[in-house]
Amino acid sequence: MNRRLSIGGITMALAVAWLVAGCGGGDDAPRFVAVPPAASQPEPGPGGGNGPGAAPAPRILVVSNRADLVSGGDALVEIQWPEGVDPATAKIALDDVDIAKAFARRPNGRYMGLVTGLKVGDNTLAAGLPSGSARITITNHPIGGPVFSGAQMQPWICATRTAKAVTVKGNAGSAPASATATTKASGLEGDPVDDQCNAATLYTYYYRKASAPTSCTFGITGGNACYTQYDPASMPADSEIADFTNDRGDTAKDLIRVERGTINRTIYALAAPFDPRDTSMPWAPPKGWNGKLVWQFGASTGFSRFQSGPTRSLFDASGGLGLQRGFMVAIASLTDHGTNANDVLGAETMMMVKELIAEKYGRIRYTIGDGCSGGSIKQASIASAYPGLLDGIQPQCTYADAFTPIIELADCGELQANYYANDPSGQALTAAQRAAINGHTSTGFCAAWISSFLPALNPSRAQNCGFPANFPLVYDRTANPKGLRCAGAEHAMSQLGSFVGDDGIERGNGVIDNQGVQYGLGALRDGALSAEEFVRLNEGVGGYDGDLVWQARRTNARRESIGIHYQAGFVSDGRQLAKVPIIDLRGNQAATGDIHANWRAYSVRDRLDRDAGGHGNQLIWKFNSSSGSSAPGAALARKAFVTMDAWLAAIEADTSANPIEAKVLSNRPAAAVDFCIASNGANDADLATTVGLEDAACPVKQQSSPRQVAGGPRAENVYKCQLKPLALGDAAYGGARFTDDQKARLAAVFPDGVCDWDKPGVGQVPVTPWLSFAAGPGGRPLGTAPVSVAAP
């Protein structure tokens, strides 16, 4: 199916006749490719061939994406001809079909074209001269996916123009076999045309009136909105349209187009400066667009099985900061963590949309990420596992990735929802002692986790999958053991894999483990716990089974389950995060309890220090707020955006051969340093007085977590620790004296030893970037990008 279905205004069908130019110069991989750099082409030998004495042959470059990751049936291609060759004499063929008319030399001097009609699978593109030929294999994937994420999750309920009841099939062996669910409304003008949820793209057009007051609200809705919708078939007169000058000095009419479509079984939307009277082809981008992209990631955590619309607004604070400077803004439901906590799917979707932008609008210079909480997870995870998709990230309400917060979440549940609540020894602990064990200023922090996200680990909770409560197809250990499991490990089963337990139930590879963890160790050392209270705590804490049911024994995760999380790139790695500038806007946590704890920004910093040898690429800008998820004030958000833009522009201009990590460090703006302010940064005056992050005057203080009190690293990226013998004379116990009975009881709690935090975790390995899960869970490196080769 041609992915370029469209509705509204003008049709954007990309035909073979779209001949490309103006996409940048030189042989370097364009920034919009955003995938591992293509392997260098062999240097031409005498006469322009591919080796000493070889006949002159062209070079073929697929520039909209890696040649093996193309989707949607088309690819932007450049052909570099040997010096002195007249391309008019050349033959260009796609699987032996002549497509020479798709190419031409453009004003930038590059010979380019958009190749369409690619079949799913391998396609051979050849360019030939009497003196020599070349060919490259382009592997095309369906516009509905997948590309590298592996087998797509089923069932998956496509969105429809208006919500309606549909029949949903359950897993094989489910009782019942099917049930009725209600679709999500798509916001499009037509229903899906296939089971990949593909539907026609909708375009809507807006202009800013020349008479609009300067006090109007930047957006398209509301009585004071700056923009008014129009029909491009009957445009307002130019005199009625305000002028707009972007950040590179280009002046155009203040016109914006919003594109809403489907890709990879999700719904995406783009907003960009766009005048429908211009050509606006990839070789002639919209005049008002500065070539930059802001990607807005949505918050929260969820494992939905429904196609739905994005949760972020293209015209919110971040989008407005970008659009007013000439940026394009992008959103997609699979990059909203509250819809999709599978960050491989998020990365794949982002790559596919960026390819679409490159082929439809032109070259992307660089991409800035933005998002709070789950939106910060998406940024860090994608930057770590799929470097190049994001060039700079602006996390707020930070978490380093999706699954390591489960460490604190499970610990809080085991401690506060069970030991403190149900065990007489736990009930006897004071609030101050409990807070000391938890690593928090109050027990409200664990309470916030337990009430908000502990249920997200429950595979029987239908709402986690987007279904109503008690939906009959969802897993129940007794009534429906073959039902749909609605937890994160199952949502990512194509990447993380699964196992069948002794009870015959298939479960995703999870990460909960507390073998060898000495809860309250720091509290014992500091005198907040007695030796007996420490022993009773570790005797009574227990653990969770595979269905989030508390049990008296501790949780002992399978080594294979733990290891695959690292192997598959689900734990963010400082080695990869060092490749992007990071500006972390750290709001103050709520004093009474907050899942967005201040220490989380330092978790990322600790990973950078441990993995990359420093954190010069990360800025932490603390501001005072009512909760950790509060948005920064307008002036602080603007300062972060402008600083990130300047940082990336400097990196873009750096033509040295230095690795990207070095370029990030050497091009950091001189004034870009850590700081803390006493307000939320609503206006410029709020930013005039700053103090250091650890200054006593900074209101944003750090805490820790139960696992850190137990001796774990602030990086909080060790699911399952390696063990060492119990040695109660160690300095870690702060000189506490244990009776023989207490020693024996601790030895019974830790028969195999206690955590050795000086060693990596079990199965803990560095991220291997750009894994493909097409061959199954665990992932395989993509390997070298395809290049053109001389053809006989």
Locate each region found by the language model.
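C-terminal motif of bacterial Sec signal peptides marking the signal peptidase cleavage site
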Residues: 19-22
